[in-house]
């Protein structure tokens, strides 16, 4: 996809409605600023009730934020557990983080994927796209090849989530173990290579992310015990080939990236059985799973796993977004 074709001059108006105005409360805080302020107050030791009083928001507003923004809910929960003294300085948006530490711009089609992972509707919609909302924890995205999804989402977004919350548990799945290992290697490099020193200094523990790590190998990594809850048994990031044994018991983010190719596109029944049995059961309470790739056939994993007849209620649970070139 030519990225220049994806950059809209203005966001499209949905459903023939007038664009919504993003209002500010009398204290001048936008919604995102209000969320950051609440996290700051909770990280300082205040209760949710007291924090809401300070930022002049209601309990209903807080509950709505939690429901609509899974990432916000995880950050608040981390702050409440007392292990988030760094939450305030870390709470950048993904585009801010990507630009500052990774020197990478987040384009609209990438932000759409991130929005869905975070439990939101895609911010940019176009008549050429297909969007079918479903459950917020099951996300499928189809788009043409060579769109940078692996670098921008599987690698950079996973890295962002680890920086925001070192207790994150991520599973990365690809068509082969070797391919998944390459994705994990890219994450490891950003956590240790001098090129990303600013990221490591601002977010990592004094000895580095790999110091005092339970494991730091080709298949899985545990962030340093100096920054991660030592009681957490599941890997920080685990790399799997489709159909492999899953080591971790739970995951906050599962990304299935390029698990279908011309060699296995016909094998969708086995792929679906493995995803439903081995992956969907491991999604944590506030977690989500993304399946992203390119359609290769009229019948493949991407179409068949959304078949309503595969589910007891005869309704597909997947939130689905297709973005053409």
Q: Which residues make up each language-model segment?
A:
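Short, flexible loop motifs at catalytic/binding sites
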Residues: 1-26, 32-325
């Amino acid at each position: 996809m030519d990225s220049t074709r994806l950059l809209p001059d203005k966001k499209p108006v949905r459903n023939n409605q007038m664009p919504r105005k993003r209002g500010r409360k009398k204290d001048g805080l936008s919604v995102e600023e209000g969320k950051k302020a609440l996290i700051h107050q909770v990280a300082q030791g205040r209760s949710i009730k007291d924090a809401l009083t300070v930022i002049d928001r209601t309990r209903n507003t807080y509950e709505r934020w939690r429901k609509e923004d899974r990432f916000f809910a995880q950050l608040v929960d981390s702050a409440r557990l007392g292990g988030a003294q760094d939450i305030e300085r870390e709470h950048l948006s993904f585009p801010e983080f990507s630009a500052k530490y990774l020197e990478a711009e987040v384009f609209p089609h990438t932000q759409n994927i991130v929005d869905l992972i975070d439990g939101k509707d895609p911010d940019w919609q176009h008549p050429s796209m297909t969007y079918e909302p479903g459950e917020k924890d099951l996300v499928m995205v189809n788009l043409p090849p060579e769109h940078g999804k692996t670098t921008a989402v599987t690698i950079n977004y996973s890295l962002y989530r680890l920086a925001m919350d070192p207790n994150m548990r991520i599973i990365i799945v690809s068509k082969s173990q070797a391919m998944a290992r390459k994705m994990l290697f890219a994450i490891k490099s950003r956590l240790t290579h001098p090129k990303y020193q600013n990221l490591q200094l601002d977010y990592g523990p004094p000895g580095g992310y790999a110091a005092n790590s339970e494991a730091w190998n080709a298949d899985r990594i545990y962030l340093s015990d100096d920054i991660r809850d030592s009681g957490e048994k599941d890997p920080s990031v685990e790399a799997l080939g489709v159909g492999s044994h899953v080591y971790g018991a739970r995951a906050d983010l599962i990304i299935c990236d390029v698990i279908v190719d011309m060699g296995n596109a016909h094998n969708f029944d086995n792929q679906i059985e493995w995803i439903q049995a081995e992956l969907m059961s491991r999604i944590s309470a506030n977690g989500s799973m993304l399946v992203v790739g390119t359609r290769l056939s009229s019948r493949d994993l991407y179409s068949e796993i959304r078949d309503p007849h595969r589910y007891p209620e005869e309704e597909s649970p997947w939130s689905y977004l297709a973005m053409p070139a």
